[in-house]
Amino acid sequence: MSNQPDHIIIFDTTLRDGEQSPGASLTVEEKLTIARALARLGVDIIEAGFPYASPGDFEAVQKIAKTVGNESGPRICGLARATKNDIKAAGEALKPAFKSRIHTFIATSDIHLKHKLKKTRQEVLAIVPEMVAYAKTFTDDVEFSPEDAGRSDPEFMYQVLETAIAAGATTVNIPDTVGYTTPSEFGALIKGIKDNVPNIDQAIISVHGHDDLGLAVANFLEALKNGARQLECTINGIGERAGNAALEELVMALHVRRQYFNPFLGRPVDSMEPLTNINTKEIYKTSRLVSNLTGMIVQPNKAIVGANAFAHESGIHQDGVLKNKLTYEIMDAESIGLTNNQIVLGKLSGRNAFRTRLDELGFELSERDLNNAFLRFKEVADKKKEITDWDLEAIVNDEIQQAPELFRLELVQVSCGDHSAPTATVTLRTPEGKELTDAAIGTGPVDAVYKAINRVVNVPNELIEFSVKSVTAGIDAMGEVTIRLRHEGRIYSGYAANTDIITASARAYISALNRLYGAIQEQTKVHPSEPVLTSKN
C-alpha cells in the first residue's frame, strides 16, 4: 500500500473522540443518526467508538457496523488499547461491518511511559508487534497510533512505527494528543517519519490533533504537504478540552485552495478533481445535527458553519457582495448546503408533502417517527403561518432525536408579571407511569419551571448553561433552547424547540434530566470491576 494516494482520506472521530467533550454523551440511537449523516456526508472512515469502554459503546459500534457499515457505506472503525481484551472487544463489535478497521494505540512519550504506563521502551517495542498481529486476526485493516507522538523521542518513535508496519499495520497515525506542536514542527515530524521509517511506503500516514493552541487545522494542512494522507477530525471540531481538528474547516480549505494543494498530491496545479470524497453540500446539515444532539452550540463566528460565516455588516462589504459575491466571499454558501431556495409548508400541507420535503432534506425516519413528526408539524402549523426548512429541522430534532422518554412533560403553566412572583405548575409522567404535579416560585418564569420540575424528579443537579435562539425571523418564530446540567461531575445536555419559549425550556430541561436519569440507571448495570474508560488519544 502506498502512502501517496492522490486524494485525502477523511477519518471522522465525532462518535469517539468528539463524544468525549463534557456533556456530549449520546444514546445509541443518536449515534446511529449521526453515523447515517456521516455516511451521507461521504466520510471514508467512521470511528464509531471504544467497544471495551462500556456495554453502551460496544452496542453502538456493533449497531453502526450492522446498519451503516454496508458494502456502499464507509469503513467502520473501533478503538482499542494495545491489550488483547480491548482488541477482542473491538473485533467482535465490528463483525457485522462489510469493511472494518481496528485502531490500536499505546503511548510512546517518556512522560507517558514513566507516569501512566510504567513501562520501559523495550517493553513497548515488544507489545506493539504482538498486539498489531493480534488485531490482524480480526481484520486486514489495522491502524496503529503512538500516543503523544508530538512529545515522543523521534528515534524511538521511528522504531515503534517500523515495528508496527512490519507486524501488519496498514495505517500509522501520528497524534498531537495535547495540541502542543506548531505547524512547522508538525510538518517536520511527518517528514522525519517519511525519511527515517524504512517501510513507511507500506502504510498510510494519518494525523490526529487537538486544538489546545488553536493550531490543529493548520498543523494538519502542513502535515498533508509533508506526506500525511489521512486526516482524523470531528464535526464542528468537538472533542476533549479545546476540541479536535474541525472536519468542515479541513474539507473546505482543501476545496477552496485546491490549486495550492494539488501539487503536494502529485496532481496538475489546475486539476479540478475534488481532493476528498466529501459531499460538501451536506456539511451545514451535519453540523446542525451534531450540535443539536450533543448540546454543543456552534459559536456564531465559527469558520464555515457559524451563523455569521456568510454575514456582512460593513456597508462597503455589503455593497461589494451585492454586486459580486466573490468580492468578499471566498466560497459560496450553497457549497456547504446553505440555500435561500426554501419550500414553505403550511397548515394545509399534507403528509405526503411533509414526507417528500423531509426526504429532500436528507432525514431518514421510520413510519412511527414520521407519524410523530407529522403530528408535531401540524401542531406548529396551527400556531405559525409558514413552516420553513429550518422549522422542519427543528421539529424533527425536537420530536424524534431525543433521549429515551423516562420522564414526560404533561403540563406546564406559568403566572408572572411586574408585581407578582413568577410561579410555575408542572405535571410530569414518571418512568413508573404515575402523574405527579408540583409548583414553585422562582426569580423568573423559567427558573420557576425548573424548580417545580426538580421538586418532582428529585435528582440533584446544577444548571450550568442555558441558551435560547430563534430558528427563523418573525414574531411567530420557533425558539430553540439548549441547556447543560452537571450531576456528580458529569454534564448532560438537553434540546427542545417550540413557538412557546417557556414550553421549549421545560422540554429541554426534561430532555437533559432523562439523559441524567438514564445514565444513573446504566451505571447500576456496569460491574464495579469494569469501569467506564475514555481514551486520551
From Swiss-Prot:
Boundaries of every Pyruvate carboxyltransferase domain copy: 8-273
Cofactor needs: Mn(2+)
Broadest EC class assigned to this enzyme: transferase
Binding sites annotated in the UniProt record for Mn(2+): D17, H208, H210, N244
Pathway noted in the entry: Amino-acid biosynthesis; L-leucine biosynthesis; L-leucine from 3-methyl-2-oxobutanoate: step 1/4
Keyword Kinase tagged: no
Gene3D superfamilies listed in its UniProt record: 1.10.238.260, 3.30.160.270, Aldolase class I
Pfam families reported for this sequence: HCS_D2, HMGL-like, LeuA_dimer
Keywords: Amino-acid biosynthesis, Branched-chain amino acid biosynthesis, Cytoplasm, Leucine biosynthesis, Manganese, Metal-binding, Transferase
Record region (Regulatory domain): 408-537
Name of this protein: 2-isopropylmalate synthase
Lineage of the organism: Bacteria, Bacillati, Cyanobacteriota, Cyanophyceae, Oscillatoriophycideae
Gene name, Swiss-Prot/TrEMBL: leuA
